[in-house]
Amino acid sequence: MPKRDAPWRSMAGTSKVSRNANYSPRAGMIHKFDKAAAWVNRPMYRKPRIYRTFRSPDVPRGCEGPCKVQSYEQRHDISHVGKVMCISDITRGNGITHRVGKRFCVKSVYILGKIWMDENIKLKNHTNSVMFWLVRDRRPYGTPMEFGQVFNMFDNEPSTATVKNDLRDRYQVMHKFYAKVTGGQYASNEQALVKRFWKVNNYVVYNHQEAGKYENHTENALLLYMACTHASNPVYATLKIRIYFYDSITN
């Protein structure tokens, strides 16, 4: 008379064969060769020429990867007369934050930070607006021109600033934005957050020097102008400015 099967044999999915197959340490080491995956992930030299010459839209025309990044972290004292900083200062080198040669393309600009007031200034009843201009200098020379030299204003008011007529072919305002802070004892807004991301595709050209300075630019320097509307109460801006750029293939 045959013995009766054990109770665990009648349970679905718990046979001895399946238990050995599932929990064996060698069960997960069997790899099946997938021809479709191998064809999709084939190396570049085995692809047609169109795949080797075509570049994705993420890479600007005439450039090559990888995407490099440079950060400018600084606290700015913004006054009524304005200030300027160059955000295309890239030193020549081999790192992920360096340019390979004379030419590169700034694909995008990311500005992150806040506008804030001093402890003594925020107690005064006033409203102060801080304005930013992202400007392209097509023919940089010497040192960056001051805010009052580039912009024409009515009654020295930065909110009415426009590029002077004789400099319109050299300076081009690519983007403009502002942030507002309010001081006072009751309805005060002592700080304002700043967050902007722009796609610019600005092709920068340097001379033979390696240092990342404005004076070494020959074409298309990126400048950030800042000014506040209040004449007597300055504000502070704690900003992290990141630019993402690609090296040119003609370097």
UniProtKB/Swiss-Prot annotation:
The processes (GO biological process) annotated in the record are: symbiont entry into host cell; viral penetration into host nucleus
The keyword Protease is assigned to this record:
no
Q: InterPro entries of this UniProt entry?
A: Gem_coat_AR1, GV_A/BR1_coat, Viral_coat
What are its GO cellular component terms?
host cell; host cell nucleus; T=1 icosahedral viral capsid
Return the motif ranges for Nuclear export signal. Answer: 96-117
Which proteins does it associate with, and in what oligomeric form? Homomultimer. Binds to single-stranded and double-stranded viral DNA. Interacts (via nuclear localization signals) with host importin alpha-1a.
Q: What is this protein called?
A: Capsid protein
What is the taxonomic lineage of the source species?
Viruses, Monodnaviria, Shotokuvirae, Cressdnaviricota, Repensiviricetes
